[in-house]
Amino acid sequence: MQAKNMKKGKSGALGKRDWVIAARKLLVRRGIAGVRVEPLAKAMGVTTGSFYWHFSGRQELYDALLQDWHDTNTAPLYEAVKAAGSDPRRQYLAFFGVWVLERNFDPGYDQAIRDWARISKKVADDLREIDGRRIQLLTRVFENFGYSGLPAEMRARVTYYHQVGYYAMHVKEPRERRLELAPYYAEILTGHPWMHALHSVDGIRAGMLGDVSFEDNWTGLEEVTSARPFSESVRSGSRPT
């Protein structure tokens, strides 16, 4: 018996991808302990024999699930930043557009992987690598803003840890409110009030979707990076202009 609620391939049979999608839903809803062959088969309306046609066992499904997470929750961040071009403001907006607008990104999936990592060294190692890659991507964005070395990396870490904490704490905040606050976060994180120039929630949303152009080339941090170290600026109470 074929599943009534799953999209079938051209042949009418459920494929390997269908199993991974079903496993993803179970992982988010019940945790890794709930991702078992019998519940999956029942949810899909097929026998367990269908599972073993595509997978040698649960570990192969788990490996496919991790790869799916890479593809759906990390690759879009790289693609968005690459498509944004060289302007760091557009890169920043693109990165946060994936997060805030949840474009090809499922925060529940990320959190489920983090929960899984608590009991699996393999998943923990994989998660650590992906977290590192995402932070490296953000570091490059901050380098394009004009920071270098540790200042760029620390801003990237604070930005990333802030967002991960937002999800981990299950903060309930309307998307419109998040967009409204975005310029204030951006000013703190990038050291410059550039996003306020987008004027409205609609303007910020459009910017996150790539529909924005800046009349000037980015030079906002030249005074900061060419003058004294960031730590000295903090001690003196100065800020970028």
Tell where the protein language model's regions lie, with residue ranges:
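Helix-turn-helix
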Residues: 18, 25-64
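Amphipathic alpha-helical segments within well-ordered protein domains
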Residues: 78, 96-97, 114-115, 139, ...
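Hydrophobic/aromatic-rich alpha-helical bundle segments in the mid-to-C-terminal region
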Residues: 145-207
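Short helix-capping/turn signature of helix-turn-helix
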Residues: 55, 101, 113-119
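Amphipathic alpha-helical packing segments from all-alpha helical-bundle domains
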Residues: 106-111, 121-146, 151-158
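N-terminal intrinsically disordered/low-complexity leader segments
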Residues: 1-14, 196-241
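Short, basic, alpha-helical segments at the C-terminal edge of helix-turn-helix-like DNA-binding modules
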Residues: 67-74
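Hydrophobic alpha-helical connector segments
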Residues: 78-109, 159
